[in-house]
From Swiss-Prot:
<keyword id="KW-0044">Antibiotic</keyword>
<keyword id="KW-0964">Secreted</keyword>
<protein>
    <recommendedName>
        <fullName>Antimicrobial protein 2</fullName>
    </recommendedName>
</protein>
<keyword id="KW-0929">Antimicrobial</keyword>
<dbReference type="GO" id="GO:0042742">
    <property type="term" value="P:defense response to bacterium"/>
</dbReference>
<dbReference type="GO" id="GO:0005576">
    <property type="term" value="C:extracellular region"/>
</dbReference>
<comment type="function">
    <text>Has antibacterial activity against the Gram-positive bacterium B.flexus and the Gram-negative bacteria E.coli and V.harveyi along with two other Vibrio species.</text>
</comment>
């Protein structure tokens, strides 16, 4: 998943 995502 994208960085900073849960």
């Amino acid at each position: 998943h994208s960085p900073g995502g849960a």
